[in-house]
Amino acid sequence: MDISRPRGTRDFLFAEMRNRKEVEGVLRRTFETYGYHEIKTPIFEELKLFTVKSGEEVVNQIYHFTDKGGRELALRPELTAPVARLYMNEMQKKPKPIKMYYFGSCFRYERPQAGRFRQFWQFGCELIGGRSPLAEAEVISLASESLHELGLDGFEVHIGHLGILRGILGREEIPSELQDRIMGVIDKGDVEELEALLGEVEVSGESRELLMKLIGTQGGPEVLDDVEEYLGGYSESLEALEEFRELVETLHYFGVDDYHVNLGIARGLDYYTGIVFEIYVPELGAQKQICGGGTYNLVETFGGERVESTGFAFGFDRLMNALGMDEENMRMVDVFVIPIQDSTVPEAIRITQELRAAGVSADLEVSGRKLRKALSHADNLGARFAVLTGEREIQDGKVTVKDMERNSQETLPRDEMVDKIKGRC
RNA sequence: GCCGGGGUGGGGUAGGCGGUUAUCCUUCGGGACUGUGGAUCCCGCGACUCGGGUUCAAAUCUCGGCCCCGGCCCCA
């Protein structure tokens, strides 16, 4: 019988786990300095939580099942919807705005490819019930600062505003559904398909030309002047532009000045309502997008009261990829204790336990190998010290401590040993 | 789903135009260096995805299944 790891999943060994925990720790600390606190939702939810949000077609990409009580459940394919559900169930009546963050794994039944896994992790946050350019700027600042804290170079923040684009479509009286479709194509960046669709939908030449111009507009905040020129009499879009300007100004106060205005960012999701942003690491090619976010309204879709949220999520695995951390030989244990003779095993056990109680990670030679082999193993473990318990030393109330890095050795009084070692670890 | 590549000792690989003892590195176990290692040497454990076919003979050719990886479609 051959049992192996399911397709699209990964095993993480010691060194990689250590790296992931480290990144996780930096993100937690940074989010918490912005006043966010962690929430956790179940790994499986009701299936309809996801179909209501994204449509029936996603069922084919969801790991779903009927439980023993006949309920249709699903392994969560993303975390935005569970967070909205949690808010609606538990926090709807609480004072606003509410800041929360989350970290967890998601599951999708899709064809794996480079960087595309069936189990993947997201680290994200939501600021619920306080939409304003100031709030939005702070969310973007948090995303940017997190990456700076991690020491990531070469990332680009791209910011768009759906209100500008929807203001044009609204003036053409394009129905909601068609607008959503158009947004999807814009997000895809397929210019030809967009032209074809706008023609099919019979958007006026003026608006069509304007849309094409806008989605190709990219650059620093100064391009907003160009955008204003393009917009002319589209009053709804101008209002959104004003909002965008306010965001830009506020970002400056947060110290965020390195970003791209990019109206081609549409996110392709119908529940987004205003600011949208994505973060890229260009050198990663097809997997360059490590973060997506913006302002949206989802709770109403699930039957709650209308409330807008601004948030984002890092693709944790993409982020790890971008950081490219080395998996150096890691120290499995600080101290390796070796009984030189069988008679010294009890003492070796006592020493090991004392070290552990003092917060020093320690392991004991349990295989009965000779000293030579045991020392070799200590090296394999990357142990900083080896402690040798021999009959001679024990008789004298001492213990031999070998520094594995310096290849030096000393004999210490038994009762001073723990403190000495602890002080050097 | 379509296209392409692949599946060889615990890990990584060579072999692949058929030849009958399957290569190399590494991991692991034992031994030699006489209570002390990171080197070296010796011995050992351990393998050709499953099924069928062709053949005196198949890891090597062929048919089918299963599995994995990459590209496309899709990507909440």
From Swiss-Prot:
Any GO CC annotation of this UniProt entry: cytoplasm
HAMAP family: His_tRNA_synth, HisZ
One matching Pfam family: HGTP_anticodon
Species name: Methanothermobacter thermautotrophicus (strain ATCC 29096 / DSM 1053 / JCM 10044 / NBRC 100330 / Delta H) (Methanobacterium thermoautotrophicum)
Keyword tags: Aminoacyl-tRNA synthetase, ATP-binding, Cytoplasm, Ligase, Nucleotide-binding, Protein biosynthesis
Compartment annotation: Cytoplasm
Protein name: Histidine--tRNA ligase
InterPro entries according to UniProt: aa-tRNA-synth_II, aa-tRNA-synth_II/BPL/LPL, Anticodon-bd, Anticodon-bd_dom_sf, His-tRNA-ligase, HisRS-like_core, HisRS/HisZ, HisRS_anticodon
EC number(s) per entry: 6.1.1.21
Top class in the EC scheme: ligase
Entry's Gene Ontology molecular function annotations: ATP binding; histidine-tRNA ligase activity
Family, per entry: Belongs to the class-II aminoacyl-tRNA synthetase family.
Keyword Aminoacyl-tRNA synthetase in annotation: yes
Gene that encodes the chain: hisS
CDD domains xref list: HisRS-like_core, HisRS_anticodon
A biological process term (GO) from this entry: L-histidine biosynthetic process
Keyword flag Cytoplasm: yes
Catalytic reaction list: tRNA(His) + L-histidine + ATP = L-histidyl-tRNA(His) + AMP + diphosphate + H(+)
